[in-house]
Amino acid sequence: MQADKVFKALGDPTRRKLLDLLCETNGQTLGQLCENLDMARQSATQHLEILETANLVSTVRRGREKLHFINPVPLHEVYERWVRKFERQRLSLLHDLKKELEGE
């Protein structure tokens, strides 16, 4: 299941940091990403591979470089499937609480 891969990828703080870096500046090379991480290139590459497997990051070759781009679609799908329904429920509970407190 694709959502399982997304949750696994998001479960690591380094991978979340990589996604944050790509949100700030999309299309970075491995070297550019490693400048902001305290780890070896090989470790960063392994994290990027997990993000690619979850379809959260895609790469494009430009000459000898690989550029890494964030793919927001899986994050949006997780939001729609898992977060949004709880958000609606929370808003409904807050509305009911407001009505109760205001004596309506």
Q: Which residues fall in each region the model found?
A:
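Amphipathic alpha-helical dimerization/coiled-coil segments
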Residues: 1-2, 24, 76-104
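N-terminal helix-turn-helix DNA-binding core of bacterial DNA-binding proteins
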Residues: 2-43, 65-77, 81
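Alpha-helical residues within the helix-turn-helix
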Residues: 35, 46, 52-53
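Beta-hairpin "wing" of winged helix-turn-helix
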Residues: 52-63, 69
